[in-house]
Amino acid sequence: MEANKIKGEAKSLILDNGVELTYCERGEGNKEVMITGAFYFHTFMPVVELLAKHYHVYGVVMRFDGSGEELEPDGSIHWGRQWGKDIYDFAVKMGIERFHYLGKCHGTIPGWWLFKNHPEVLIDFCSFFLAPHLKGQTSNTWFELLSGNDTSKMMAAAMRKVETGLPKKMEEMKSIGNSASSPAVPKYAACPEKLWDTLEDCERDLLNAPVPVGYMFGSEDPLMADYFESNMYAWKVTRGCHFTILNGEKHLMELDTPERVADEAFVFIDQAHKDYE
């Protein structure tokens, strides 16, 4: 169990294929289920706690190792697809038939896999800070910051409230240690479109979206700027989507204003199932 990747009580589940998944569980008294995936749950935990006021929330750690069934042509694991399959297998094992899915940045990848392969289990899908990229990349600021040695520069670009947010982020990284990084991150974590064989297939599925999709971005997020044209195009082609850009917000919005992240999810879910015809 990767208990160090969760702040507070951590649990684990052994899937039928023998893989162990680490997860947290909050809001057990609520009827509706929400699943959210992430590499770790420390600075994102306040969002989980807020979501748990309305939903029975499972936060599932997206793993970097172990066996997998979703493979690349060369036999290596396609981690983008495997993260999605893990969430699906988790839900099946837990007896969860349908659920809301919320992902932020890399955490959206399992949601897009479910959207593509098992939309029947999704009530709706909050895809926050990331959309499939159908129009290419205009810059590479975010991953250049991540790979650089200037932590203060990266944090200043990633959050508004550096003075309060930086200590929390550094505490998180200390708890996680070397397990925070993997070659899977730059290859799969910011590229939902890689779940499809072609961009044409991806666009077709967006045009015929089988479940409500809620996009949210921060106007000052470097990753938003890196894929600006693609993000705006996703808004145009995703059938019936909810699309929000929050002025002034940056990438680590869960540190700056976790309440608004949760509130945007609540607003989207409330509107997603109303009949506007």
What residue ranges belong to the model's regions?
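Conserved HGGG/HGGXW glycine-rich cap/lid loop of the alpha/beta-hydrolase fold
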Residues: 15-70
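Active-site loop/oxyanion-hole signature of alpha/beta-hydrolase fold enzymes
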Residues: 58-102
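Short beta-to-alpha linker loops that shape the active-site pocket of alpha/beta-hydrolase fold enzymes
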Residues: 61-66, 131, 249-250
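Gly/Ala-rich beta-loop-alpha elbow adjacent to hydrolase catalytic centers
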Residues: 103-107, 111
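Flexible "cap/lid" loop of the alpha/beta hydrolase fold
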Residues: 112, 116, 122-153
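Conserved alpha/beta-hydrolase catalytic His-Asp/Glu region
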Residues: 136-137, 152-209
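Conserved loop-alpha-helix segment in the C-terminal half of the alpha/beta-hydrolase fold
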Residues: 214-249
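Catalytic active-site module of serine/aspartate enzymes centered on a nucleophile-bearing elbow/loop
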Residues: 240-277
